[in-house]
């Protein structure tokens, strides 16, 4: 296993750590005994996990460590991190105010991309959808939005959230189009023909 893949796995392992610390912080808020040390710890863990996305990509390119495992784990780690943070911020007592439209677009994109990848893999046998620059931009912008939300920097968060949502929506449409083209090329979308007379 490559160093880049190990960094990606480390990012995945940080997700439950973040969730645990974040939930304890939310509990302290609910009990009117807010522990800002937990909030800071959660933000630090989230920041490390987010930055590791750039690190594993750089390591993979710099040391020629691109692999099929890394190509699967890296976007999966990003999606799991985004969904986990959204879940904590939306369904706990964290004092944040994420725009509903940002949450809907972010969750829809991540869920559809995961489900779409499994569907294409099931129907076609392999997924050959290349990352688009809009998707590469939407992920760090979404992570930055979530980080600013946890820092309660709402004025800075809003324009970043708008950009993140535009790129997320655009990349989602592009990936759906590319997936459909791949399914069409395989002939899996055609209904079976009936018996001939």
What are these model-derived regions, one by one?
Residues 1-197:
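Alpha-helical transmembrane bundles and membrane-interface segments of multipass inner-membrane proteins
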């Amino acid at each position: 296993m490559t160093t880049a893949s190990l960094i990606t796995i480390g990012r995945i392992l940080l997700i439950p750590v973040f969730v645990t610390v974040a939930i304890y912080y939310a509990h302290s808020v609910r009990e009117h005994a807010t522990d800002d040390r937990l909030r800071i710890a959660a933000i630090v863990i989230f920041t490390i996990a987010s930055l590791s996305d750039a690190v594993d990509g750089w390591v993979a390119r710099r040391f020629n460590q691109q692999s099929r495992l890394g190509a699967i784990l890296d976007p999966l780690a990003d999606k799991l991190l985004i969904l986990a943070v959204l879940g904590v911020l939306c369904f706990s007592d964290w004092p944040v105010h994420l725009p509903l439209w940002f949450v809907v677009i972010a969750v829809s994109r991540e869920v559809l991309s995961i489900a779409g990848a499994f569907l294409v893999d099931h129907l076609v046998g392999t997924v050959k959808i290349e990352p688009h620059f809009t998707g590469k931009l939407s992920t760090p912008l979404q992570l930055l939005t979530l980080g600013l939300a946890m820092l309660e920097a709402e004025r800075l968060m809003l324009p970043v959230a708008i950009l993140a949502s535009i790129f997320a929506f655009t990349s989602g449409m592009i990936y759906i189009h590319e997936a459909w083209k791949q399914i069409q090329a395989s002939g899996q979308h055609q209904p079976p023909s009936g018996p001939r007379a």
